[in-house]
Amino acid sequence: VETHQPVTRYGAPSGPVRIGLLDGHRVAFLARHGEGHSLPPHQINYRANLAALHALGAGRVLALNTVGGITADFGPRVLGCPDQLIDYTWGRISTICEEPGTEVVHVDFGEPYTRSLRNDVIAAAAAAGVALVDGGCYGATQGPRLETRAEIARMRRDGCDLVGMTGMPEAGLAREMGLDYACLAIVANWAAGAGPDPDEVITLQDVLDNVAAASSGLPRLIASLLARQTAE
């Protein structure tokens, strides 16, 4: 495994980028929350993270996001690949088009996730026998606190199926940088008031167990995705 500590024009990324071989394919991994999960969502340097991956040769980014479920198809232990998102964050640097001399580019963001990569992920999951919900809307909130029941009720009315804290500005920045980008949403728990028991108390152990269950097929899915990329 190679370990890289790149510094980009946007500063340092959240931590080292590790590059290794998976079934003969070079794969880069970067923990967006930093070593030991030390960075809250609003303090992540999303620009530097993506720029570091880009500089090391990455052209496709598969983002892993732990989320809460809002609608019935996205209960705990579900793995999803959303096709839409709504941004509720604020105060985060959300563009690379703000430095002096930088050309302002108004990128098309009607489909926030790259369709070709999403299609490959969905096909790879099917080939690997990994259950995956195709579609859904990810609502990106500010964090690090969790949401109120009223906020989740509003998000449901807005059309959100999932809620997380790191989906934006990451997806928008990836589009500006020309990176293919898709999300694998790992449902850890019901969002506030969204489950069948609105008074349910979620424990840390519940969350850890649910994440482990939803993530169990990821190695097979990713291996299948890499095999498809080679075939293409």
Please place each PLM-identified region on the residue numbering.
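Metabolite-binding pocket within alpha/beta catalytic cores that recognizes anionic/polar moieties
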Residues: V1-F109
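His/Asp/Glu-rich mid-to-C-terminal helical/loop segments that flank catalytic regions of hydrolases
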Residues: A191-E232
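Short acidic/polar active-site loop segments enriched in Thr and Asp
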Residues: G59-R60, D161, D180
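Non-catalytic positions within long, well-ordered alpha-helices that form the structural scaffold/packing
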Residues: H54-G57, R156, R175
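Zn-dependent metallopeptidase/amidohydrolase metal-coordination segment
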Residues: M165-Q205
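Active-site rim beta-loop-alpha module in soluble metabolic enzymes
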Residues: E111-R156
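Generic hydrophobic/aromatic pocket-lining and core-packing "Φ" positions
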Residues: L50, I152, M168-A171
